[in-house]
Amino acid sequence: MTEGIKLTSLVKAAGUAAKLGPAGLEQALSDMVREDDPNLLVGPETADDAGVYRIGEGLALVETVDIITPLVDDPYTFGRIAAANALSDVFAMGGRPVTAMNLVFFPACALPGSVLSAILAGGHDALREAGACLVGGHTVEDDELKYGLAVTGLISPSRVVRNATARAGDRLVLTKPLGTGIVSTAIKADMAPAALTAEAVRWMTMLNAEAAGLMLECGASACTDVTGFGLVGHACEVARGAGVTLRLHLEQVPVLDGVMGLVADGLVPAGCYRNRDHYAPFVGAPRSDDDRLLPLFDPQTSGGLLLSLSPSSAGRFLAAAGDRGLFALEVGEVLPAGECAVDIV
């Protein structure tokens, strides 16, 4: 039985907000030796969503791993969100997920085995929806619950979509609204309205598969998924990798209804402030202390795709998304490199 168990009460931080902050991570990775392998097509140099390794003529592996803490209290839903979050990295690269392995850190003394069974069932159902096969996994008994997956996908090397290839003149399109990290903080505090919780869960359990398929149809210049470093953090990675500036229009960036009310109540994850403090030197904004900016730094879990498309491709993408009932909004444009990596207007 899993009723009455509040998973979020067992962890310090929820979802992707539990990741290491960008400053500490960059420092830890700064001394890594670059791999000298001609088959490694995408490595860690531009902080892309997944690695890509060529295994034959016209075929490459897309490899990623993602582990999160609970950001909702229902075990099955947590498992489904965690799997959607891990799969997203493969979709963002333009790949097709084929296999996955569970990674479980479980407090066996604090939770019954039925909780783990429900988590794994949720993850498995998301994998099946994505057309991927679960091939195994690994467990560790831990004081804090964590669950994620290592996912492998396939891709043609000529169809890899990177985060460092945005071009000046491109339009920026976002495929999910922001605010799930803030909502998760409210869930942990028992202060999230039921309707807002349900809406956040709907977005977090939604796979990025259809949006990624449309991306390939329309020919995006670049793509990344918006996760733990927030929209601005991942936009900075795109800008620095491509040598451009990304301009975001604050009023055009979608935020879940009700999130700003939670911000006003102080229900903002520490990871949001960590992201803001780290990326502030690279961002031009009217006022960095404006609360309206906080959702742009909010750590997202299973967030949407941030796409960089030529004006004509963006038009096709938005029109096709509308026809197919997919969420997509133009949120900015790509400029030649300026004084900042991301300019918020």
Curated annotation (Swiss-Prot):
Q: What Gene Ontology cellular component terms go with this record?
A: cytoplasm
Cofactor(s) the protein needs: Mg(2+)
Q: Which GO terms describe its biological process?
A: selenocysteine biosynthetic process
Q: Where is this site: Important for catalytic activity?
A: K19
Show the Pfam families listed in the entry. AIRS, AIRS_C
Kindly state which reaction or reactions the protein catalyses.
hydrogenselenide + ATP + H2O = selenophosphate + AMP + phosphate + 2 H(+)
The top EC class, named as a word, is transferase
Catalytic site residues?
A: U16
In this chain, Mg(2+) is annotated as bound at D49, D89, D225
The cofactor note from the UniProt entry for this protein is: Binds 1 Mg(2+) ion per monomer.
List residues binding ATP: K19, T46, A47, D48, D66, D89, G137, H138, T139
Any one GO MF term held by the record is: magnesium ion binding
Which Enzyme Commission number(s) are on file for it? 2.7.9.3
Q: Which UniProt keywords apply?
A: ATP-binding, Kinase, Magnesium, Metal-binding, Nucleotide-binding, Selenium, Selenocysteine, Transferase
| Positions in coiled-coil regions | none
Tell me the PANTHER family matching this sequence: INACTIVE SELENIDE, WATER DIKINASE-LIKE PROTEIN-RELATED (PTHR10256:SF0), SELENIDE, WATER DIKINASE (PTHR10256)
Name the HAMAP family for this protein.
SelD
The family this protein is said to belong to:
Belongs to the selenophosphate synthase 1 family. Class I subfamily.
Question: What is the role of this chain?
Answer: Synthesizes selenophosphate from selenide and ATP.
Subunit comment for this entry? Homodimer.
Its protein name is: Selenide, water dikinase
Native species of this protein?
A: Geobacter sulfurreducens (strain ATCC 51573 / DSM 12127 / PCA)
